[in-house]
Amino acid sequence: MTSTFLRSFVLGCLLISTSLFAAAQRFRAIVPYVNEGGKLIVSLKVNGQQGRFLLDTGAPCCVSHEFATRIGLKAGEMRTGEDSNGRAVQASLVSLDSLQLGAVTFRNIQAMQWEKGNPTAQLIDGILGYNLLRMGIVKWDTRQRQFIFTTLTEGLGLDPSRALPLLPNDYVPMVAVRLGKTANDTVMFDSGAEGFYEMSNRQRERLTKSRSTARILSTADGTLSMGASGIEGVTTKHRILIPQMEIAHFRFADVATITTDGTASRLGSQLFNYGDVAIDFPRRTFYFLPHPAQKEPLKVYQPEWEVVPTITADGTIVAGIVWNAKLPICQGDRIVEINGKRCERIDFAKAVSTPPFLLSGKKTEIVFIPQGSTEERRLTIHCK
C-alpha cells in the first residue's frame, strides 16, 4: 500500500445554480485524462486559454484566483457553501464566456473562484463540476483513459443490469448502495475524492443501532483530510470493515472505510480501478460497468498504517491519527524523519502537487518528537 501526506484532498461542494447551456442539443466530447494520485485531470480551454481541470462530480465548476486573473475574469458576488468536511467556505461567483472540452464549446458557464493563494492552484487551474456535467451523460472509460461527455447513448456500452436510479438531489449524483444483506447507505459519487468508500458518521450511527455485520476495527481522534476550507479539525474517526458491499448489483468484499464528518458518505475514484462509471443525468441513472476480469465478490481490503502522517499549514508533519493506542506516539506529535529522509519543514503549497514522502511496504521507521519535548524517538510502524 502507498500512502501520501494527506489521506484525501477533496475539494468542497458549493451549491450554485445550473449554468446556462448554449451548446448544441446533440454533442459528444471525448478527451483523454490523466490520473495523478487518484485525481482525474483533463485539459480544456476557458475563454480560449488552456488549463488543467479536475473532473469532480462532487463540486461545481471552479477556477483558481490565479487562472481567473490570467484570463481576465472579474469576481462577482460571494457565495457560501460547505466543504467535504462539512465546514463553511466562501467563494466568488464568476461567469465563463466559453469552455471548450474536446471539439465541443459551452457558453456562459457559472463557476466559483477560489481565494488567492489556495494551495490547490499548485496542482490544477480549476474544476469541471456538476453544474455543467449534469446537463448530459458522462462516462469514464478507464481502459482507454478517456472522459466522455455527451447527450448520445450510442456506443457507451451502458448495461441496464449494472444500473442504479439516481436519488433526488438538485446538484450531486446520489445512489443507494447495499451494506451486507439488510443495511443500505445513501452515497454521493464523488469523482474528485481519492478513496473507494468513505462512510459518514451519520451512517455509522445508524449501523450501530442495527444488526449489521460491519465491524469497527479501531477508533481514534485525529485529522486526515483537507477540504476547500483547509485541513479539517481533530475529530473522532472509526475504521470499519464491511464484509460485503453491493454497488449497482456488483458485490465487493472486505471493504475497509474510515468515517468522515461530511454530510454524506462518498464513493470515490478508486472505484475506477475495477470498472467504468457512467452517469446519465437526464435519465437519472448511474452505471458501474465492471471490467470483464473482475469476479464477484471482489475483495478490496486496504491495509492502513498504524500512524498516518499529515502535513500542517505551517509546513511541519505530525501524526494525523494514531490507530494503535499501544504505540508511544500521540496524535499531534511532530514527525521529523520517514524512511531515513528528514522532513522537518515542508513547503505546503508544493506538497499539494508533489507529496514529500511515500509510505510503502508493510513497515517503516519514523522519527518523532513528543509534544512538550525536544527528544527525538525512533519508532517502527506497520501497515495492516
Regions found by a protein language model. Give the residues of each.
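Bacterial N-terminal signal peptides that target proteins for export
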Residues: M1-C13
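N-terminal signal peptide c-region/cleavage motif recognized by signal peptidases
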Residues: S17-S19
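Pepsin/retropepsin-fold aspartyl endopeptidases
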Residues: A22-K384
